[in-house]
Amino acid sequence: MAGGGLQTAMTARTLESHPIHLGKGATAVPQPEFPRDERAIQWYRDYGARHADDGEEGRLVSCYGFAEDWPGWEMHPAGAEVVVCLEGSMTLIQKIGGEEVRTTLKPGEYAINPPGTWHTADVPEAATGLFITAGAGTQHRPR
């Protein structure tokens, strides 16, 4: 294998159940199964600990389905976040200069949350999104 890395067998997984960590050295590391319940907060804490050495260069690639508006706001101070709509539609809401800026995404469209930008989303019906997130230091607050 080029670069002297270890070669491992490929395993098919779904991004919704097993997110991927993109790290330093162009690594891509499948993550443990993501729980869809109260254990999710601990999963994120454990993820941060597992990949702390990547710091602000680490990215989480994840996929989530939504049936309703997001209940809170979030902000990623370490870097930009890419949001891609895969199915349905979602309106991404960003707080920029004290104003709410709304961008509606349809399948195949994306938007970027700049570092430090508080954001949430309205989901009029069901939607699925792909997220590439610089998660170090992520903050949350109620909507």
Set out the residue ranges of the language-model regions.
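Short, conserved beta-strand element in jelly-roll/cupin
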Residues: 77-92, 132
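Short, charged beta-turn/beta-strand-edge "cap" motif at the junction between a beta-strand
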Residues: 117-120
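A short, N-terminal "cap"/entry segment at the start of jelly-roll beta-barrel domains
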Residues: 1-72
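Short beta-strand segments in beta-sandwich/barrel cores
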Residues: 71, 88-94, 109-110
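Short glycine/proline-enriched turns and hinge-like loops at secondary-structure junctions
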Residues: 76, 104, 123-125
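Short acidic-glycine-tyrosine-enriched beta hairpin
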Residues: 97-115
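A short beta-loop-beta micro-motif enriched in histidine and acidic residues
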Residues: 56, 67-82, 98-99
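A short hydrophobic beta-strand segment most commonly corresponding to one strand
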Residues: 61, 125-142
